[in-house]
Amino acid sequence: LGKMWWISCNQNHFYNYSRKIAYNLEMIYKSKVLELIHSAVKSPRAIILFGSYRKGDDNERSDVDIAVEILGDEELRIIKLGTMPHFGYRYDVPVNIHIFSRNKIDLNLFANIANGIVLEGFLEVRP
């Protein structure tokens, strides 16, 4: 059969993370996900990208996690917004939105969201 070369990059290298985060943000804004969120959630207070796409360690099985803060006392709801048919170099990427109100969220989940990137609005982090 012959020899086959296997080439890969060091995915843990800082350069990959720093460039990939900026690339992921560009793909989020180009994909019109924010418009879909506004049609699904009325009057969001803040829209935050969190999880693997925020950290830059997403892979071919990762989904896009976006948190949406709303006013009120509603329990956390996770809605599958759909799949993005073409999202950068990937196809059929699932997008989930986590709708939460400040008064009814687990503190560990909120800490994860607070370390995300605010795409729109203002996320107030208070003790």
What are these regions (language model features)?
Residues 46-53:
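Short helix-loop-helix/strand-helix junction enriched in hydrophobic and basic residues
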Residues 1-43, 55-61, 70-127:
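Catalytic core of pol beta-like nucleotidyltransferases
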